[in-house]
Amino acid sequence: MKSKIKKIWLCKWKDITGSADWSSPERAAKEEPAICYTVGFIVHQDKHKTIFSNEFSLVDPAEIGNRTVIPNSVIVKKTLIHTIKEGGKHGM
């Protein structure tokens, strides 16, 4: 099997929040978007979006599961947290 490098990323991003309760305009003005975190492998990235997966299969054909598509416009930061080598003598 050919060796492949897989990188595990931590992505910090902003998400929409909402509420159905009654509130003063002043209190509502203090509300903020939710800060969310996704951990996984980046399986696709272009100028509009980044797609993460936190599961992959080593069978042929390789497949991925548990995908999260995040618009790049809401991503605050991406941090590389781990690199693994798939295949080869010391791989998975």
Over which residues does each language-model region extend?
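Conserved RNA-binding domains used in RNP assembly and mRNA/RNA metabolism
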Residues: 2-92
